[in-house]
């Protein structure tokens, strides 16, 4: 669920998804095209690919079980879809934390029109 993903991002990075990640680069937020701009944008690209493998699931709105304890995100038991969506979100949030040192404020509200070239394949 998008609100759960936002909480994971905040837990890992101490930044709110909106505004820091919702419009970042070419892949953070809705959709994406071209090449990822940096490590942060690549986290979002990989997250999009992860969701892409779950076409039968309601990736944006399914509510899943998870916990935020002792510095770790742990996904809980649920339906296959819930567990997979949680894992996609957990891995992405951890990736965003690892990419904090190269976060560029210039990519924060990056216009889609500047995302050119062939899109990478998952």
From Swiss-Prot:
The site annotation (Responsible for the weak stability and toxicity) covers 1
Which SMART domains does this chain map to?
Answer: PA2c
A Pfam family that the UniProt record links to this protein = Phospholip_A2_1
Q: What transmembrane ranges does the database entry give?
A: none
At which residues is there a site annotated Responsible for the higher anticoagulant activity (compared with CBa2)? 117
Q: Active site at which residues?
A: 47, 89
Keyword Metal-binding included in the entry's annotation? yes
For this chain, the annotated S-S bridges are 26-115, 28-44, 43-95, 49-122, 50-88, 57-81, 75-86
PROSITE patterns referenced in this protein's UniProt entry, alphabetically: PA2_ASP, PA2_HIS
The cellular location(s) given in this protein's UniProt record come to: Secreted
Q: What cofactor(s) does the depicted protein rely on?
A: Ca(2+)
Site (Putative interfacial binding surface (IBS)) residue list: 2-3, 7, 10, 17, 22-23, 60, 103
Q: In which tissues is it expressed?
A: Expressed by the venom gland.
What does the sequence similarity comment in the record state about its family?
Answer: Belongs to the phospholipase A2 family. Group II subfamily. D49 sub-subfamily.
Q: What else is known?
A: The crotoxin heterodimer is inhibited by the crotoxin inhibitor from Crotalus serum (CICS). CICS neutralizes the lethal potency of crotoxin and inhibits its PLA2 activity. CICS only binds tightly to the CB subunit and induces the dissociation of the heterodimer. Tested on the CA2-CBd heterodimer.
Function according to Swiss-Prot or TrEMBL: Heterodimer CA-CB: Crotoxin is a potent presynaptic neurotoxin that possesses phospholipase A2 (PLA2) activity and exerts a lethal action by blocking neuromuscular transmission. It consists of a non-covalent association of a basic and weakly toxic PLA2 subunit (CBa2, CBb, CBc, or CBd), with a small acidic, non-enzymatic and non-toxic subunit (CA1, CA2, CA3 or CA4). The complex acts by binding to a specific 48-kDa protein (R48) receptor located on presynaptic membranes, forming a transient ternary complex CA-CB-R48, followed by dissociation of the CA-CB complex and release of the CA subunit.
* Protein's recorded name: Phospholipase A2 crotoxin basic subunit CBd
Organism for this UniProt entry? Crotalus durissus terrificus (South American rattlesnake)
């Amino acid at each position: 669920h998008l609100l759960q993903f936002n909480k994971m991002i905040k837990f890992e990075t101490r930044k709110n998804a909106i505004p820091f990640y919702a419009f970042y680069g070419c892949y953070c937020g809705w959709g994406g095209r071209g090449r990822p701009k940096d490590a942060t944008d690549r986290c979002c690209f990989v997250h999009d690919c992860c969701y892409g493998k779950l076409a039968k699931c309601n990736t944006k709105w399914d509510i899943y079980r998870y916990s935020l304890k002792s510095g770790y995100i742990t996904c809980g038991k649920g339906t296959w879809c819930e567990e997979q969506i949680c894992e996609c979100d957990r891995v992405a949030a951890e990736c965003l934390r690892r990419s904090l040192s190269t976060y560029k404020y210039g990519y924060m509200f990056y216009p889609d029109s500047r995302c050119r070239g062939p899109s990478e394949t998952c």
